[in-house]
Amino acid sequence: MINGDINEFIEKLWSGEELIYVYNGKKYFSQGYIKEDKVYVFELQMWEPDVKTLWQISGKDNQESYEIFLEQPLFDGKTFWEIEKDTEWVDD
């Protein structure tokens, strides 16, 4: 993880905090939240070069959502763990 500690990033990811990170020239945003009907939602959006929701899961708890997210090939066909060393954690 560039510009950050991977353990801190993963802790924030697990807790659903809003995170912004860049991989391969693309800016990503992820967050988890509880809707009014008490359903937990975790989502991944791309902010640059295009704005779109890439992936979303709902109805699972944060732990299960987090584990499923980490297994998905969402980043140019790679999982988060495959891109982690080349990913920059940004705050903007």
Residue ranges and their predicted role:
Residues L54-D92:
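Acidic, low-complexity intrinsically disordered segments
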Residues M1-Y23:
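Negatively charged, low-complexity tracts enriched in Asp/Glu with abundant Ser/Thr
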Residues Y28-F29:
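Short, isolated positions in well-ordered beta-strands
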